[in-house]
């Protein structure tokens, strides 16, 4: 079952992106590189509750 998760920037802490993932297939926390408007560059975003 897919669940909606929030992605937060590792450097600034801002929560900008929503995505979904299947927790059965990927139990570890998701990490994606996304654009951060505050930093004006791509940064690492990690899954938060």
Swiss-Prot record:
InterPro entries: Ribosomal_bL33 (IPR001705), Ribosomal_bL33_CS (IPR018264), Ribosomal_bL33_sf (IPR038584), Ribosomal_zn-bd (IPR011332). GO terms for molecular function: structural constituent of ribosome. Pfam families: Ribosomal_L33. GO terms for biological process: translation. PROSITE patterns: RIBOSOMAL_L33. GO terms for cellular component: cytoplasm; ribonucleoprotein complex; ribosome. The keyword Ribonucleoprotein applies. The keyword DNA repair does not apply. Keywords: Ribonucleoprotein, Ribosomal protein. Belongs to the bacterial ribosomal protein bL33 family. This is Large ribosomal subunit protein bL33D. It comes from Enterococcus faecalis (strain ATCC 700802 / V583). The lineage of its organism: Bacteria, Bacillati, Bacillota, Bacilli, Lactobacillales.
